[in-house]
Curated annotation (Swiss-Prot):
Quaternary assembly: Part of the 50S ribosomal subunit.
Family annotation (PROSITE patterns): RIBOSOMAL_L2
Keyword tRNA processing: no
Organism encoding this protein: Triticum aestivum (Wheat)
Gene: rpl2-A
Upper lineage: Eukaryota, Viridiplantae, Streptophyta, Embryophyta, Tracheophyta
GO cellular-component term (any): chloroplast
Name of protein: Large ribosomal subunit protein uL2cz/uL2cy
Length: 273
């Protein structure tokens, strides 16, 4: 990720960074409108997430997560930024005239050729099933089930590693450190996801964060008792409870939110860190 520092005497943007490497100029047939109606409220208008707000107006880019253009070579024409995700996207022109967006593999440049299918070369950006990948291969945009499209390792800089094979199943190490079993006939894209180091970007000011739908975070201990269970007291007072809670009294800071009996529990060999 190429970062550009603001050169300004204004305190709000003095330490902010911009990504000057790519710009977005999407094709009209690969975008559509997207209505965001949440804004941290439920159907009755009651606040359910106090740190979520309205995001800046944007258009959704149709991303090809399935990579189902089998054995047809495609050429990378542009590398663009996507306001709906923290990773770059690439515009691909296939040999049959099809044009699609895919996630940008790290190191791919304009003019490179990619292909998806079985028995294709194991090179950066190619999509193929795990049966054709040797152990130790790094990948991103991994499918859970054949034909459903990539669901794992899709964030900027994400990478999963092929650890083992047994029968029709394979073992992967995900970016979170979790060990998961997946089917070998499912597709994955070779290489690491691009835009590494996006977590080191400094927004510089609160307005840039509000564009992303993130509102200011206020501690409960500085609120009134009517607004939060931690509120009230004289001066800097403790929360008055054994454990911290949410504004609605539920346990916070460490409570597991995953369903106890989820169908995919049997596919997890090692929990994430």
């Amino acid at each position: 990720m190429a970062k550009h520092l603001y050169k300004t005497p204004i305190p709000s943007t003095r330490k902010g960074t911009l990504d000057r490497q790519v710009k977005s100029n999407p094709r009209n047939n690969l975008i559509h409108g997207r209505h965001r109606c949440g804004k941290g409220r439920n159907s009755r208008g009651i606040i359910t997430a106090s740190i979520e707000g309205e995001v800046i107006k944007r258009l959704y880019r149709k991303i090809d997560f399935r990579r189902n253009q089998k054995d047809i070579s495609g050429r990378i024409v542009t590398i663009e930024s996507d306001p709906n995700r923290n990773a770059y996207i690439c515009l691909i022109h296939y040999g049959d005239g099809e044009k699609r967006y895919i996630l940008h593999p790290r190191g791919a440049i304009i003019g490179d050729t990619i292909v998806s299918g079985t028995k294709v070369p194991i090179s950066m950006g190619n999509a193929l099933p795990l049966t054709d990948m040797p152990l130790g291969t790094v990948m991103h945009n991994k499918e859970n089930t054949r034909g459903r499209g990539g669901q794992l390792a899709r964030a900027a800089g994400a990478v999963a590693k092929h650890k083992a094979k047994e029968g029709k199943m394979a073992t992967l190490r995900l970016p979170s450190g979790e060990g998961r079993i997946v089917t070998q006939n499912s597709l994955a894209t070779v290489g690491q996801e691009g835009k590494v180091g996006v977590n080191q970007k400094s927004l510089g000011r609160a307005g840039s964060k509000c564009w992303l739908g993130k509102r200011p975070v206020v501690r409960g201990v500085v609120m009134n008792p009517v607004d939060h269970p931690h509120g009230g007291g004289e001066g800097k007072a403790p929360i008055g409870r054994k454990k911290p809670t949410t504004p609605w009294g539920y346990p916070a800071l460490g409570r597991r939110t995953r369903k106890r009996k989820k169908y995919s529990d049997s596919f997890i060999l090692r929990r994430r860190k």
